[in-house]
């Protein structure tokens, strides 16, 4: 096989007159009155190859037998296309290759779908033939971008003096949040390793070991319910540092992300990134990961409506809840009564008991609840919401968390439906000052908002075991376009604080020692103050590539039901394998 001289997609006018050797796949073949044209594709793009009997009759005869997706080597000379033959849609569209020789390296069956962008095919089929799906230029470009992003992170962290250190995949199962993927031990029957949900504890131990700055581009595993931006295995940019403040860790993160966006998209992002507290994010946007590319902010109108004779509002306020509204500017005409009923059904998914609404027409409030607002109150409400003719006012009344969840989700829905979002914009945001705990209704107790190793604010440490709800954390999340792309914090580095944290979470001293004894021991040997962050590589690439599903940014992903259609994983194993592991399977009973 002759050595390749160029990639197909790299050829341009500078190559005119040069002899080239190309390897690639036949994208398309056209037979036009004695001439054959082949679009040859490789990872860098497509170039047109011309087979002319006057130049090489033998090459033309071989080209006549090739079909789509055949793998070939072509030798020829680069020529300029004629003025009328220039293809502006193609990067190589001003040149073509006049073929002298063609060698068929391998044939191909007819693919189950066209290998081209925009092909209408089910996700299931795409994943079953993922190796074909990845040939499509748009998919190829995503993984070029992923490589650029990964390389940029590595280069930046290396320049900042971080050590790339690997942590084990076979580790101990600890109660950190989601369910673990378990791996049975053959040597110790009845015992299991766990695949890591993150290298959290181990990277903290590397700080105890004195490495000062650690990073790892690491695979993590969580056995949880899936959705569009979740996968059972995912990759994070994981880093940890000693002796730095949270502001310094955030500055390092910003520097990395600015470089990544510049390299991947050639867009310059301003620093420092905007920031807001968790409370402000929930109050204004109803979300702890707000998309700040558009308005539609939530506004508290409890004081305005507390005296109106509308029982839904009155009841919510009397029971310690609140009434909030969104003013969708100039949107009243966009929504019929039927549309508004549908929005009511939508917010019910988030716990809301309904969605009240008003329209502003000719200076007056119109709608089902307008009768509850006498002129003075109507004027006060319009002033409070800066409402004008044509505006649509949407209200939720309930407990604060339900109001936030329902109006926050509604805000995101309206932002898309009303075309308020600039899809080209990249809006980074820090969300800071998180509560250390959140209340789990199902468990009936407080659980870690992030993880049990997050450092409480110093002034709140005495409250750990007495008033958990008031303890704030030295935690920070980084958000991009409404997605959480990373979470970090300063960590607990003193044993007595970690013991107090475990007790606050309901661990007995004995159970804490059993689960985390190795960490507690390490904290007795001079662990330095430390902190870090983990950034979701798959999600960052998803956003930069303009996709809406993580599957597109992972080479061999799972479906929404955690199945791999390509390999048919997960699958059953043999009785011999189970016997070796001293395991039995329990068959699910079916009616």
Curated annotation (Swiss-Prot):
Q: Which GO terms describe its biological process?
A: aspartyl-tRNA aminoacylation
State the source organism's domain of life: Bacteria
Name the InterPro entries for this protein. Aa-tRNA-synt_II, aa-tRNA-synth_II, aa-tRNA-synth_II/BPL/LPL, Asp-tRNA-ligase_1, Asp-tRNA-ligase_1_N, Asp/Asn-tRNA-synth_IIb, AspRS_core, GAD-like_sf
Principal EC category: ligase
Provide the catalytic activity annotation: tRNA(Asp) + L-aspartate + ATP = L-aspartyl-tRNA(Asp) + AMP + diphosphate
Q: Matching CDD domains, A to Z?
A: AspRS_core, EcAspRS_like_N
Q: Which Gene3D superfamilies match?
A: Bira Bifunctional Protein, Domain 2, GAD-like domain, Nucleic acid-binding proteins
Could you give a GO molecular-function term held by this entry? nucleic acid binding
Give the residues the record marks as binding ATP: 222-224, 231, 484, 536-539
PANTHER family, A to Z: ASPARTATE--TRNA LIGASE, MITOCHONDRIAL, ASPARTYL/LYSYL-TRNA SYNTHETASE
Query: By what name is this protein known?
Result: Aspartate--tRNA ligase
């Amino acid at each position: 096989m002759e050595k390749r001289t160029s990639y197909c997609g790299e050829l341009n006018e500078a190559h005119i007159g040069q002899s080239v050797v190309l390897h690639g796949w036949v994208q398309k073949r056209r037979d036009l009155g004695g001439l054959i044209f082949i679009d040859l594709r490789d990872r860098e793009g497509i170039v047109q190859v011309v087979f002319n009997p006057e130049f090489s009759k033998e090459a033309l005869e071989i080209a006549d037998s090739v079909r789509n997706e055949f793998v070939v080597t072509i030798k020829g000379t680069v020529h300029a296309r004629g003025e009328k033959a220039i293809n502006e849609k193609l990067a190589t569209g001003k040149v073509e290759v006049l073929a002298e020789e063609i060698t068929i390296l391998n044939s191909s069956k007819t693919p189950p779908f066209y290998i081209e962008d925009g092909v209408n095919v089910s996700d299931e089929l795409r994943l079953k033939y993922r190796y074909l799906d990845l040939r499509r230029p748009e998919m190829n470009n995503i993984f070029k971008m992923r490589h650029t992003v990964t390389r940029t992170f590595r280069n930046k962290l290396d320049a900042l003096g971080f050590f790339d250190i690997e942590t084990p995949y076979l580790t101990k199962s600890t109660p950190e949040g989601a369910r673990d993927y378990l791996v049975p031990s053959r040597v110790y029957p009845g015992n299991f390793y766990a695949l890591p949900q993150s290298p959290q504890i181990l990277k903290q131990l590397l700080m105890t070991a004195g490495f000062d700055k650690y990073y790892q581009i690491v695979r993590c595993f969580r056995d949880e319910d899936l959705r569009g931006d979740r996968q059972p295995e995912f990759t994070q940019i994981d880093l940890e540092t000693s002796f730095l403040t949270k502001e310094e860790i955030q500055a390092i993160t910003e520097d990395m992300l600015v470089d990544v966006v510049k390299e991947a998209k050639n867009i310059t992002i301003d620093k420092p990134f905007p920031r807001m507290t968790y409370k402000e994010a929930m109050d204004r946007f109803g979300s702890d990961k707000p998309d700040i590319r558009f308005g539609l902010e939530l506004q508290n109108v409890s004081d305005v409506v507390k005296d109106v004779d509308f029982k839904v509002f009155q009841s919510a306020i009397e029971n310690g809840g609140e009434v909030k509204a969104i003013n969708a500017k100039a949107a009243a005409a966009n929504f019929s009564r039927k549309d508004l009923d549908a929005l009511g059904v939508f917010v019910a998914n988030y716990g809301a008991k309904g969605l009240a609404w008003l329209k502003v027409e000719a200076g007056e409030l119109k709608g089902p609840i307008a009768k509850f607002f006498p002129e003075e109150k109507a004027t006060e409400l319009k002033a409070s919401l800066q409402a004008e003719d044509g505006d649509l006012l949407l209200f939720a009344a309930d407990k604060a968390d339900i109001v936030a969840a329902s109006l926050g989700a509604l805000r995101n829905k309206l932002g898309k439906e009303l075309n308020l979002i600039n899809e080209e914009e990249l809006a980074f945001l820090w969300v800071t000052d998180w509560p250390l705990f959140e209340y789990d209704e199902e468990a009936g107790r407080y659980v870690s908002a992030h993880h049990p190793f997050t450092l409480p604010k110093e002034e709140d440490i005495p409250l750990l075991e007495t008033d958990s709800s008031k303890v704030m954390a030295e935690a920070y999340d980084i958000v991009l376009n409404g997605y959480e792309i990373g979470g970090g914090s300063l960590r607990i580095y003193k044993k007595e604080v970690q013991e107090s944290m475990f007790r606050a979470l309901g661990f007995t001293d004995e159970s804490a020692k059993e689960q985390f004894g190795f960490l507690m021991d390490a904290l007795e040997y001079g662990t330095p103050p430390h902190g870090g962050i983990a950034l979701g590589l798959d999600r960052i690439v998803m956003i930069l590539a303009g996709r809406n599903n993580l599957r597109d940014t992972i080479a061999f992903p799972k479906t929404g039901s955690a199945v791999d259609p390509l390999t048919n994983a997960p699958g059953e194993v043999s009785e011999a394998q189970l016997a070796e592991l001293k395991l039995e399977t329990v068959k699910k009973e079916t009616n």
